[in-house]
């Protein structure tokens, strides 16, 4: 399905009351991630993979100049993307499921991991987070996170 210009792939939506994990990906459908998650037999999981992310904008909480020659700057569009998640994307995902999930988590790696943690400070739609190798180095993030309160 396509919502707000993002391709969304949902795996395991037949699992009623399963936990819902939302992953933002640079590109791809996340089938391999879902297959790996299926190895955890004791927990029913639904995975929603959102692709076509503008990585240097939507995953970043602030601006950052290019890190190396030929790199693009980060433009700090995370708050706008969070509003899209709240208003359109997550409701569309929930409408596709065969029941309400036990909880909704967000997971990400690199800038996606930074975004996952940042989102806990900005929205109540996620009650769990996983950040794999999150970009905690992002300029000003540690200071910013020390000033914000999680909902």
Task: Give, region by region, the residue ranges found by the protein language model.
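Non-catalytic cap/lid and distal C-terminal segments of serine-dependent acyl enzymes
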Residues: 1-151
């Amino acid at each position: 399905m396509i919502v707000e210009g993002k391709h969304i792939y949902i795996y395991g939506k037949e699992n009623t009351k399963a936990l819902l994990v939302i992953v933002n990906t640079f590109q791809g459908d996340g089938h391999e991630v879902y297959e790996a998650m299926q190895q955890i037999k004791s927990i029913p999981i639904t995975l929603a993979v959102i692709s076509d992310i503008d990585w240097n904008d939507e995953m970043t909480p602030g601006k950052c100049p290019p890190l190396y020659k030929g790199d693009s700057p980060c433009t700090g569009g995370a708050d706008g993307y969070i509003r899209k998640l709240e208003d359109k994307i997550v409701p569309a995902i929930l409408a596709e499921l065969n029941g309400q999930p036990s909880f909704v988590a967000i997971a990400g790696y690199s800038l996606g991991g930074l975004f996952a943690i940042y989102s806990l400070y900005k929205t109540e739609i996620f009650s769990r987070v996983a950040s794999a190798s999150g970009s905690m180095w992002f300029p000003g993030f540690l200071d910013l996170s020390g000033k914000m309160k999680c909902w």
